[in-house]
């Protein structure tokens, strides 16, 4: 007797349906029952009543602003980083500022930033247009004396520590 036939008729095995019979099909659980059960649980949890506190007011009668909301709506038509077209554009007041005729510190900072960036731009343009130009880097010699040696190579000017370094530089082919 083989081991297969030994356990085939054993009383320990539970009777089971054949492979192709419908008893083996898994019945799918309906989702409606689960959804209803969760809705009932949520309804039971939300039965208690909460007291809503009265709205806060400051001593001057205004509502507090904790930095999460602003009275201004952002304008998408203006570019953030566009430079002012004329000096009068920095002094032009917005619609709300015309009514209140006040400037907030943030607006003052924006104007200061524009003014500083315009001044820096003018300074850099004036340095490039000046006849003196940049004189190069002044390297310090071994004895502490400053020697100014600038060399031009392929359209760029750079400083070297001495004439020996300049001799080792490759010569451009067009010279």
Swiss-Prot record:
Biased composition (Polar residues): 1-27, 58-77
Major localisation: cytoplasm
Disulphide bridges: none
GO cellular component, one term: cytoplasm
Localization annotation: Cytoplasm
Gene Ontology MF term list: mRNA binding
InterPro entries documented for this protein: PNRC-like_rgn
Biased composition (Basic and acidic residues): 100-113
Assigned keywords, A-Z: Acetylation, Cytoplasm, mRNA processing, Nonsense-mediated mRNA decay, Phosphoprotein, RNA-binding
Residues passing through the membrane, by range: none
Keyword RNA-binding: yes
Modified residues (N-acetylserine): 2
GO biological process terms, semicolon-separated: deadenylation-dependent decapping of nuclear-transcribed mRNA; mRNA processing; nuclear-transcribed mRNA catabolic process, nonsense-mediated decay; positive regulation of translation in response to stress
Key word Metal-binding present: no
Sequence ranges of Low complexity compositional bias: 35-47
Record-listed Phosphoserine modification sites: 82
Protein name: Enhancer of mRNA-decapping protein 1
Annotated source species: Saccharomyces cerevisiae (strain ATCC 204508 / S288c)
Organism lineage: Eukaryota, Fungi, Dikarya, Ascomycota, Saccharomycotina
């Amino acid at each position: 007797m083989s081991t297969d036939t030994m356990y085939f008729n054993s009383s320990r095995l539970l009777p089971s349906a054949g492979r192709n019979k419908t008893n083996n099909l898994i019945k799918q659980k309906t989702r409606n029952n689960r959804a209803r059960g969760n809705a009932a649980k949520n309804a039971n949890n939300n039965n208690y009543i909460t007291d809503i506190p009265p709205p806060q007011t400051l001593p001057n009668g205004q509502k507090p602003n904790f930095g999460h909301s602003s009275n201004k709506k952002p304008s998408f038509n203006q570019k953030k980083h566009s430079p002012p077209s004329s000096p009068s554009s920095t002094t032009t007041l917005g619609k709300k500022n015309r009514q209140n005729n006040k400037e907030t510190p943030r607006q003052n900072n924006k104007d200061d930033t524009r003014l500083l960036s315009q001044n820096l731009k003018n300074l850099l343009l004036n340095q490039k247009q000046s006849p003196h130009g940049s004189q190069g880097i002044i390297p310090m010699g071994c004895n502490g004396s400053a020697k100014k040696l600038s060399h031009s190579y392929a359209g760029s000017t750079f400083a070297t520590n001495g004439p020996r370094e300049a001799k080792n530089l490759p010569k451009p082919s067009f010279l």
